[in-house]
Amino acid sequence: MKGQKSYRIKKNDTVMVVTGKDKGKSGKVLRVIYKKDRAIVEKLNMIKRHMKPSQQNRQGGILEKESPIHISNLMLICAKCTDPTRVGYKVLDDNKKVRFCKKCNEVID
């Protein structure tokens, strides 16, 4: 099958980490990496990079940045019920496919 993978989690969603060192923490998805089945979440799974001085980073030193988390370790947080929830898909009357919260049946997008 050609084309891009589809995930229940997208950019700018608020998610909660289900397993791992940041379990229970939540943040906003900055980027989804489809080829590796991972997502980068704001201020979660932080790593330290030792950088040499270069043209872009003149001073160098130790930088902290977000590291990708596997998509299976994330759960979407519903905006209405503010709980981590599973996501379903349904087709509206105007033939538009949308995501919905399985707990409160609220349309997410």
Curated annotation (Swiss-Prot):
Keyword Ribosomal protein assigned: yes
Family the UniProt entry places it in: Belongs to the universal ribosomal protein uL24 family.
UniProt superkingdom: Bacteria
Gene name per UniProt: rplX
Organism, scientific name: Syntrophobacter fumaroxidans (strain DSM 10017 / MPOB)
Gene3D superfamilies: 2.30.30.30
Subunit structure: Part of the 50S ribosomal subunit.
Short name of any one Pfam family annotated for the protein: ribosomal_L24
Protein's recorded name: Large ribosomal subunit protein uL24
Any one GO cellular component localisation term in the record: ribosome
Listed GO MF terms: rRNA binding; structural constituent of ribosome
Keywords from the named record: Ribonucleoprotein, Ribosomal protein, RNA-binding, rRNA-binding
InterPro entries in the record: KOW, Rib_uL2_dom2, Ribosomal_uL24, Ribosomal_uL24_CS, Ribosomal_uL24_KOW, Translation_prot_SH3-like_sf
Function of the protein: One of two assembly initiator proteins, it binds directly to the 5'-end of the 23S rRNA, where it nucleates assembly of the 50S subunit. One of the proteins that surrounds the polypeptide exit tunnel on the outside of the subunit.
One of the GO biological process terms: translation
CDD domains reported in the protein's UniProt record: KOW_RPL26
